[in-house]
Regions:
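Gram-negative bacterial Sec-dependent N-terminal signal peptides
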Residues: 2-20
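Metal-centered catalytic cores of metalloenzymes
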Residues: 21-74, 78-168
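Short, charged juxtamembrane terminal tails flanking transmembrane helices
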Residues: 191-194
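A short, hydrophobic C-terminal helix/tail in secreted or cell-surface proteins
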Residues: 170-189
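Detector for methionine-enriched segments
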Residues: 1, 58, 73, 177, ...
């Protein structure tokens, strides 16, 4: 019993650690839906996309499903004038996004220091260099002013969209609670030995 309790505590700590570490690496999520579009629509389509930003590399993983018609394009828009609202120009087009499908997945990596990944109008509007465009995009993501948009034939202005939001970073209290819990388990195990 004592040994299984210790193993259980160790397993719980190991299970929590990767999730907490991953959140600190620059993980961004976008939960896209029809009601989040501008204007809102009744599409049952959805996506829970993940963007991982490490240095100048942004990796996108965009699964999507239940769209009402075939896809025509997808991209990241930036920079709205207020968080979680408004429309903005295209910042990064997904040039190889799967077209004509109602569900699927898209994965790609973007080098934010490469001018060719940006829409030319976005690049020009934000300083004309990849460094300034990338800085504007990162600032907009931090301010919740950038969004993912998937367009379809039925909704050419966009069937589903979701604002990019930083995944929650655990507060120091989370680690403290984990430490207190493990210490408590250790004390219980020690008591039972005596």
């Amino acid at each position: 019993m004592k040994r299984s309790l210790s193993i259980l505590a160790l397993a719980a700590a190991a299970a929590c650690a990767p999730a907490l570490a991953q959140a600190q690496d620059g993980i961004i999520r976008a939960v896209a839906s029809g009601p989040a579009e501008s204007p809102p629509n009744g599409s049952p389509g959805s996506s829970v996309a993940t963007f991982d930003i490490e240095g100048n590399i942004m990796t996108a993983d965009v699964p999507f499903r239940d769209l009402l018609s075939g896809t025509t394009m997808a991209h990241i828009h930036c920079c709205t004038t207020a968080a979680f609202t408004g429309v903005a120009p295209i910042a990064i087009p997904f040039t190889d996004f799967p077209l004509g499908v109602t569900s699927g997945s898209y994965s790609a990596s973007f080098d934010l220091s490469d001018a060719t990944i940006y829409d030319p109008a976005f690049l020009a509007a934000f300083g004309g260099t990849p460094a300034s465009a990338g800085a504007a995009l990162i600032e907009a993501i931090a301010s919740n002013e950038a969004y993912l948009n998937i367009h379809t034939t039925q909704y050419p202005a966009g069937e589903i969209r979701g604002f990019l939001v930083a995944a929650p970073i655990p507060e120091p209290a989370t680690w403290g609670m984990l430490g207190v819990g493990l210490a408590g388990l250790g004390m219980m195990a020690r008591r039972r030995r005596a």
